[in-house]
Amino acid sequence: MKKIAFVFSYVPHGVSLGREGLDLLLSVSIMNSKISVFFIGDGIFQLLKNQKPDEILSKNYVLSFKILPFFGIYDFFLCNESLKERGLFKKTDFLLDVSILSAIEIRNKLKNSDLIINF
């Protein structure tokens, strides 16, 4: 099986990329079990707890990220530099058990992927 990396780099609300990425991630997980998910830049907000998208008339799809382990997806990585730039530091701020890596470590992991899909 190919190693597939999904990279989320956009905010969860105001654009549909996050929702589309999550939909594709769930679809691909049925056929492939070597999936890693990376959150860089504003993409780190995809996993942030206690979001209230209904206040901006948006749907709260981010809670759906919590079902990914049931689909055999366990490798979630957040960019440490992105966290610091946005004032987020605690792993407990996020919906999933994540590994926090430097940008260089993320780049090295992405190099080992056969396919990289960015949302």
Swiss-Prot record:
Gene Ontology biological process terms in this record: tRNA processing
Q: Does the keyword Cell membrane apply?
A: no
Q: Has the keyword Nucleotide-binding been applied to this entry?
A: no
Highest taxon of the source? Answer: Bacteria
Q: Which InterPro entries match?
A: DsrEFH-like (IPR027396), Sulphur_relay_DsrE/F-like (IPR003787), Sulphur_relay_TusC (IPR037450), Sulphur_relay_TusC/DsrF (IPR017462)
Q: Could you tell me the gene encoding this protein?
A: tusC
Q: What does this protein do?
A: Part of a sulfur-relay system required for 2-thiolation of 5-methylaminomethyl-2-thiouridine (mnm(5)s(2)U) at tRNA wobble positions.
Instruction: Give the originating organism.
Output: Buchnera aphidicola subsp. Baizongia pistaciae (strain Bp)
Q: Which UniProt keywords apply?
A: Cytoplasm, tRNA processing
Q: Which family does it belong to?
A: Belongs to the DsrF/TusC family.
The primary location reported for this protein is cytoplasm
Task: Summarize the subunit comment.
Answer: Heterohexamer, formed by a dimer of trimers. The hexameric TusBCD complex contains 2 copies each of TusB, TusC and TusD. The TusBCD complex interacts with TusE.
Q: What is this protein called?
A: Protein TusC
Compartment annotation? Cytoplasm
Which cellular components does GO assign to this protein? Answer: cytoplasm
